[in-house]
């Protein structure tokens, strides 16, 4: 068993990853994110990642109505840290590949070789209609076809002195982008569709997967590993997990109930509608959703022992290469996790490699 990677999903949007009026409410500020990044550095996590979001979901909490821009914030955090990997998110439908290539070559230089590019293809119409770049004629498959060509262009610009490409989505003519990065930035991609997994196997170094069950997660992880191997490559698999840790299971469960009681149903409905669910159906679902819907990912609640055992179980059973963690209370929770759970996970990994 190889050592696993553990990192955090930074709270780059207000409210972090909880849609609740009673949960902790990180603000969309550099100060918040810098503190979280420094906690990650100090406790020994492997990476920090931020999303890219252009429009929030309203509701009582105005969830993600305020968010920072991923690339500029992560460049600042690269300067503020020394060790953790710096993974920023880039929309392939927003940025010309020549612009993206130059930006990430710069981040790779600033970070001393720690940069990573989380590539997303822009699936939510509401984010991009507001500034006139949503192409409603592109299907899901078309967006991945565009993203494959975009990624090919970026990676070629990182290593070739001149690139010419003519595609339905962009044109490069004798395009130069120097200096080249000292090493290629890590490429990350999230998604579980057939098109997403095909893209991950061909281009990504890491894939973020979300299964509706542990069985599905296991199947997805095995599929991405196998597809990448068939392409002569290695692609690590990750999932996301929210950690609610306290001294006892009962105290952690109490937090879950308190935060669930304040679930922001309007924001939930708006989020679901952004996925393409008809508005009446989205609102009907949100009105009947249980409080746990306030959590945007799977979660574990409990003592240090409970959290440790749960993480070991899901990572082992699904053959994941790591997890990206979310902490509702970043300041105190990350310190507690670093003092208790993370050392146990590292010891478990080390024992497994002997």
Feature-to-residue mapping (PLM):
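Hydrophobic faces of well-ordered beta-strands that scaffold small-molecule active sites
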Residues: 4-8, 48-50, 86-90, 115-119, ...
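Alpha-helix-loop-beta-strand connector modules within alpha/beta enzyme cores
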Residues: 61-87, 146, 342-351
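An alpha-helical appendage that flanks or caps ligand/catalytic pockets
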Residues: 2-4, 8-12, 38-42, 123, ...
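Catalytic cores of alpha/beta
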Residues: 98-105, 247-253
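Glycine-enriched alpha-helix->loop->beta-strand junction motifs that scaffold or abut catalytic
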Residues: 80-83, 111, 202-208, 318-319
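N-terminal beta1-alpha1-beta2 module of alpha/beta enzyme domains
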Residues: 1-80, 180-185, 256, 283
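Active-site mouth loops of central-metabolism enzymes
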Residues: 17-30, 89-98, 181-192, 243-246, ...
């Amino acid at each position: 068993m190889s050592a696993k990677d553990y990192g955090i999903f930074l709270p780059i949007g207000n409210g972090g990853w909880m849609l609740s009026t009673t949960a902790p409410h990180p603000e969309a500020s550099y100060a918040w994110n810098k503190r979280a990044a420094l906690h990650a550095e100090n406790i020994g996590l492997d990476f920090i990642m931020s999303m890219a979001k252009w429009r929030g979901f309203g509701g009582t909490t105005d969830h993600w109505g305020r968010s920072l821009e991923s690339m500029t914030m992560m460049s600042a955090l690269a300067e503020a840290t020394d060790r953790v990997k710096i993974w920023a998110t880039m929309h392939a439908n927003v940025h010309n590949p020549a612009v993206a290539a130059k930006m990430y070559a710069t981040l790779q230089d600033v970070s001393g070789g720690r940069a990573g590019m989380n590539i997303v293809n822009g699936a939510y119409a509401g984010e991009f209609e507001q500034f006139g770049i949503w192409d409603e004629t592109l299907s899901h498959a078309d967006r991945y076809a565009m993203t494959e060509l975009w990624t090919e262009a970026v990676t070629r610009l990182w290593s070739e002195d001149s690139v010419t490409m003519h595609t339905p989505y962009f044109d490069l003519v004798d395009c130069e982008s120097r200096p080249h990065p000292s090493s290629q930035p890590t490429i990350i991609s999230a998604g579980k569709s057939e098109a997403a997994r095909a893209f991950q196997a061909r281009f990504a170094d890491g894939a973020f997967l979300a299964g509706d069950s542990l069985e599905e997660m296991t199947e997805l992880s095995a599929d991405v590993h196998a597809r990448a191997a068939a392409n002569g490559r290695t692609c690590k698999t990750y999932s996301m997990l929210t950690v609610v840790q306290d001294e006892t299971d009962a105290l952690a469960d109490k937090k879950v109930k308190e935060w669930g009681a304040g679930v922001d149903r309007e924001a939930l409905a708006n989020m679901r509608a952004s996925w393409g669910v008809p508005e009446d159906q989205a609102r009907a679902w949100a009105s009947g959703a249980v409080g746990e819907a306030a959590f945007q990912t799977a979660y574990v609640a409990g003592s240090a022992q409970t959290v440790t055992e749960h993480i070991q179980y899901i990572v082992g059973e699904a053959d994941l290469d790591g997890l990206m963690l979310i902490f509702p209370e970043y300041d105190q929770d990350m310190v507690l996790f670093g003092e208790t759970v993370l050392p146990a996970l590292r010891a478990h990994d080390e024992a497994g490699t002997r």
